[in-house]
Amino acid sequence: MGTLRVRKIAAIVGLVLAWLILLFLHTWATLAIYFANYHHPLARTLLPIIYVLVLILLVILVRRPTRRLLAVFVVFILVILWWICIQPTGRGDYLPPVAVLAYPEFHGDLVTIHNLRNFDYRTRDDYDIRYEDRTYDLKRLKHVDFLINYWDGKRDTAHTALSFGFDDGQYVAVSVEIRGQKGDTYEFLRGLFKQFELFYVIGDERDVIRVRTNYQNEQVHLYRTNCTPVNARKLFADFLKGADTLRAHPRFYDTLFANCTTTLIEHINRVLPTKVPFLQRRMMNGYTDYAAYENGWLAGHDSFAELRSKSNINARALKADQDPDFSRKIRTHFDQDQQ
């Protein structure tokens, strides 16, 4: 009698858990249908409602609990099959800063970067569009700097990027971003549902960094990393190849799984011996600099509080602005550390 009762309770608990899981899955599916791209705006309202009504009808009309569960699950599978068929095109009415993909050509230790971005800004939205071809000697690549910037005054979320420094004072910034189209506005939820494509900005620091410090009023912190020249070259080449891949195989941006930080870490984990733990890739990327410090990736012997205080480059960037020596002048805190 006791065993039978336990089995009944287990069956009820299992059924409740199954329905809770299905509720979560169908909530996701409803949002996926809602956020999909439609030719007619009315479809965004009607299709999710129809989807929910179909589910309700199945729950009412299918009598046996197991069959009801199976029927509702099959509907979810149909949504998944539709979802898989949605692929990025690499074609769109993109905003000028993300309209042109950079790509590399390797010739031994020399790499030519085509379409390197070097916009000259007068305001956030007023700029001269410039794409350049530049050649770099990978043997002269010496270090990697880590950038983290905050756009809303909050510490939890941030944008992260890297900059690769050569022994002749040149720097190439690499920033993974949304490939926004004209009229687009970023929303956290939309970023979960294949609404944006991924883009690699490969550019001059006077563009990639200066636009954030001087024209978008973001707080930018710049850290020197402990990455060796050998690993810096491997990492730089891997980023360039990643950017090149997007020409033939566009990717979707994803708020949680394919954003500025997770993509950056994807390259780091592919190339460098030290791997970034899974949870640190996704949770509160505004603290990525602290995670890098804790993992011994940042150079210097200061406490993190001291290092972070010195790393803010906004005042130096505003002062340097149009100066051709912009990259050196935003790094005077590195000179202080060496004294």
Question: What residue ranges belong to the model's regions?
Answer:
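Activation targets extended, charge/polar-rich intrinsically disordered C-terminal tails
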Residues: R7-L58, L240-Q339
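Structural signal for the C-terminal ends of transmembrane alpha-helices
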Residues: L58-P65
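Internal/C-terminal transmembrane anchor helices
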Residues: P65-P88
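Juxtamembrane/interfacial segments around transmembrane helices
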Residues: R68-V74, P97-A102, L116-D133
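Alpha-helical transmembrane signal-anchor/signal-peptide segments
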Residues: P88-H107
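Juxtamembrane extramembrane loops of integral membrane proteins
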Residues: D109, H114-L116
